[in-house]
Amino acid sequence: MYTFSGSKPTQLYMDILSTVIKEGDVLAPRGKRIKEIRPVMIEFKNPIRRTTFLKGRNINPFFQVAESLWILAGRSDVGFLLDYNKNMGQFSDDGVFFNAPYGERLRFWNRSDANNFIYNPLDQLRDVYEKIKADPDTRQAVAVIYNPLFDNINNDTKDRPCNLLLSFKLRNGKLDLSVYNRSNDLHWGTFGANLCQFSTILEAMATWLGVEVGSYYQITDSLHVYLDDYGAKITEDIQKVYGVNLETDEAPVVEDFEELLDPNPRMSYTMNELNQFLNEYFGIVDSLMRDDETYMHDGDCAQMLLNQIRHEPDEYIKVTLLLMVAKQALNRGMKDTVATAMNWIPLCEIKVSALRFLYKSYPEYINQYDLDEKLMKYIRREE
């Protein structure tokens, strides 16, 4: 078994990539060549740090936070995610719903919008919360994603879940989360989505319980990179930027800027408060945020929306919403609204990732920042 452990996710990313390239077996499931190591356990010792800074790897942080909010709300709709990542529609069978959305599985187990099915839906996250509240030492705080009813071979779908099960343990005053996974693409799964998704769920649950965040463990039976498509170019770009051949060279030490950045914004909402916020957001605010009219007329409505968000009491939610407004404004070429939203975000990891994403579109705005030269080189992609 391969094991990796650390508190610096960027270095973990590089170390794991190096191991996959050096030691992975070449296979071709569905006719697509991969290099694979298995089984693998990754321990993220400080999962509040959910942003990575590998040069040569450009991650969409706007999508990461929007998808995490979408999961917490138990959503299954494709349309919401398309505003933050236009490629997500390829994983839906009908272009309307996903077959195996993590949020719907976790918060409305036994409901499937894609399959027009509902039978006594269960909020598994509330079940986990109640079990730990009743018995802090419990070993029964489990939430299941894989559902044979919809994920069997006879359901011809593009979307079967890679992540299967979540297991929470409260130990020594800290909440740990272990996620069990059948298949994990290193670039698009582990570090492109899962670290952000599941560390956010872990932080939410720890906040509801009033305990500290512990470790996040990702246990997978196939950790891989693609050799010809999907993430193949990402692997090539990373090796080129760092001047290494990971088949023969040692993994380099990589920069993560920890000492230059403010602490990441933290959640504060209780479970009931977050549920109320999510109901209000998706019931009222989301349609306003995604409406073209909001960003017209010199952006007056967008400015009003930003002013409301600025007074959001939960710092994590506030930063998430500011990033979402910035992406909506970016989609419509509203530079001033993008700048206003970004200026109200503290200089934390997710902001640096967002500035890097924005640089090609708005270099003149980004260059106004007076930041450490190492940060500015990363943001400008001077690699």
Swiss-Prot record:
Record keywords: Host-virus interaction, Inhibition of host innate immune response by virus, Methyltransferase, Restriction-modification system evasion by virus, Transferase, Viral immunoevasion
Residues the record marks as active site: 162
InterPro entries in the record: Thymidate_synth/dCMP_Mease, Thymidate_synth/dCMP_Mease_dom, Thymidate_synth/dCMP_Mease_sf
Main EC class the enzyme belongs to: transferase
Record's catalysed reaction(s): dUMP + (6R)-5,10-methylene-5,6,7,8-tetrahydrofolate + H2O = 5-hydroxymethyl-dUMP + (6S)-5,6,7,8-tetrahydrofolate
MF term (GO), any: hydroxymethyl-, formyl- and related transferase activity
Transmembrane segments: none
GO biological process, one term: dTMP biosynthetic process
Superkingdom assignment: Viruses
Enzyme nomenclature, EC number: 2.1.2.-
Subunit-structure text: Homodimer.
UniProt similarity note: Belongs to the thymidylate synthase family.
Role according to the record: Catalyzes formation of 5-hydroxymethyldeoxyuridylate (5HMdUMP) as a step in the pathway that replaces dTMP by thymidine hypermodifications in the viral genome. As a final result of the pathway of hypermodification, hydroxymethyluracil substitutes for a subset of thymidines in the viral DNA. These modifications probably prevent degradation of viral DNA by the host restriction-modification antiviral defense system.
Protein name: Deoxyuridylate hydroxymethyltransferase
Organism of this sequence: Bacillus phage SP01
